[in-house]
Design a protein with these regions (language model features):
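Alpha/beta-hydrolase superfamily serine-hydrolase fold, recognizing
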Residues: 1-200
Length: 200
């Protein structure tokens, strides 16, 4: 079963909506036919930030056990200081200029005192989080912050599968008929299947 929230507002509204969806799934697992041992979060781009933030929230505040997090070219760091961000002013579909504008609008001016769920890389600790699949794209301004987040998870003892996909860009998977897209969708599906089988 896939549950998704519709996001249309500033921080923290999208995060609150995502957490509410996760809480609903956890609290109503029996009625929904959901196995709590096989509950995962996932998202791409800004949705990857929300998924990673939800995983942190589930660990710290909610008493919800997740079996997996699927993070596809995720936004993780509002500081935007990586090499790929500096190189990525004109990357296809998404670039550093748009990313800077997004953070300014989302955070309404700056990072301020927003907790790490707004920018998961700001977390004080990464231990105790669920295993992760982190996919990054070669020509994406977000490439390095995805790699950095995966490295932070691994350093904390979290099992992480990193897919650093060559020849791709942010949102490349909109081209559903392309062979490479099909290959990556299968890799993502395989990672989820493996996680769900372990949680069974």
């Amino acid at each position: 079963m896939l549950l998704s929230a519709l996001f249309q507002r500033y921080v923290p509204a999208a995060f609150a909506d995502a957490c509410a969806a996760l809480r609903y799934a956890w609290d109503n697992a029996a009625a929904l036919g959901i196995d709590r041992m096989r509950l995962a979060v996932g998202g791409d781009s800004a949705g990857g930030a929300l998924a990673a933030g939800c995983a942190q929230w589930a660990r710290d505040c909610a008493g919800i056990g997740l079996c997996f997090q699927l993070l596809l070219y995720p936004v993780t760091d509002c500081r935007m200081q990586t090499d790929s961000m500096r190189r990525g002013r004109d990357t296809p579909l998404w670039n550093a200029r748009l990313n800077r504008r997004m953070w300014r609008l989302y955070l309404r001016g700056g990072a301020g005192d927003h907790p790490s769920w707004a920018a998961p890389m700001l977390a004080e600790r990464f231990d105790g989080l669920p295993p992760a699949y982190v996919e990054v794209e070669q020509f994406d301004c977000l490439h390095d912050e995805g790699i950095d987040y995966a490295a932070a998870l691994q350093a904390a003892g979290v099992s992480v599968q990193v897919e650093d996909v060559r020849g791709t860009f942010h949102g490349f998977d909109v081209f559903r008929k392309a062979d490479l897209v099909k290959k990556q969708i299968e890799a993502r599906s395989r990672a989820l299947r493996t996680a769900f089988e372990k949680g069974a």
